[in-house]
């Protein structure tokens, strides 16, 4: 039987921040899951063991894991054989169905947001400060893709991780002077792995891809999602009235999601209401 994998990082996070991710995923999917956690995340470790989840412990800090996770993921995949892999964020995602029960069009699949790069100050900043104005101008009309959800075959995911790792090493985020002088991470650059992902995809450095629209695709990245519709089961629907497979960044639209998320939490056995 061919196996699939969900792989994510959750260094320094609390159990309650991840309960919705874990329980909603395990409601629909019983195959392999791997979490990267910190060495001091003891309560989280217990919860992951209870849910039969692989654990990788790291000394890397919560602030640095955003970049370093790709190397850890790549190392984990050595000598492993999976059919498809979902690499995703953890804290701000919940699932509405099995992420692998869908006929994805690409060997590797990326999921768009609802804004152009030039219209988002965060994505604009990440690309300018890693690749420069000239490269930014070449892709600034492209729609943002979210690096927090990537689905593909093992070989393409490995290729993608390798490209990300190489570009993180080659194109350093230009920190503000006060952070450079004190050898600290610039907080504005912590999400710029997404800048690398957008550069790699929109410059066509990886082939056999498919880009799914946010409104009609299988994954919802809701920060810039234009229309929010729920059915009577509290499921978020796309423009075809199909439930999204997963919902990402729901906390950024919390007023619109609170009642539905709390109903979902009750249904999957989470007592604590937010």
Regions found by a protein language model. Name each.
Residues 1-5, 266-274:
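Juxtamembrane luminal stem/stalk of type II transmembrane Golgi/ER carbohydrate-processing enzymes
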Residues 34-36, 85-89, 94-95, 109-111, ...:
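A structural signal for short, well-ordered beta-strand segments and their strand-loop junctions
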Residues 139-258:
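Catalytic core and acceptor-binding pocket of nucleotide-sugar-dependent glycosyltransferases
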């Amino acid at each position: 039987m061919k196996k699939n994998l969900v792989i994510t990082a959750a260094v320094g996070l609390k159990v309650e921040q991840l309960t919705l991710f874990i329980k909603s995923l395990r409601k629909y999917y019983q195959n392999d899951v791997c979490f990267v956690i910190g060495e001091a995340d003891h309560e989280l470790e217990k919860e992951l063991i209870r849910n039969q989840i692989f654990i990788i412990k790291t000394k890397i800090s919560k602030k640095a894991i955003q970049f370093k996770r790709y190397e850890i993921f790549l190392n984990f995949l050595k000598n492993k054989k999976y059919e498809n892999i979902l690499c995703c964020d953890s804290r701000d995602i919940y699932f509405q169905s099995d992420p692998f029960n869908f006929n994805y069009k690409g060997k590797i699949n990326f999921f768009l947001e609802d804004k152009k790069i030039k219209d988002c100050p965060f994505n604009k900043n990440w690309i300018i400060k890693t690749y420069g104005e000239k490269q930014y101008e070449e892709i600034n009309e492209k729609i943002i893709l979210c690096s927090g959800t990537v689905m593909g075959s093992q070989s393409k995911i490995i290729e993608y991780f390798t490209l990300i790792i190489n570009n993180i090493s080659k194109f350093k985020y230009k920190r503000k002077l006060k952070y450079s002088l004190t050898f600290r991470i610039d907080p504005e650059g912590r999400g710029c792995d997404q800048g690398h992902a957008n550069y790699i995809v929109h410059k066509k450095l990886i082939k056999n891809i498919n880009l799914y629209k946010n409104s009609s695709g299988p994954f919802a990245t809701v920060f810039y999602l234009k229309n929010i519709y729920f059915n009577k089961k509290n499921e978020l629907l796309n423009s075809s009235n199909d439930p999204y497979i997963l919902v990402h960044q729901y906390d950024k639209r919390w007023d619109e999601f609170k009642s539905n998320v709390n109903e979902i939490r009750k249904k999957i056995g989470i007592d604590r209401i937010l």
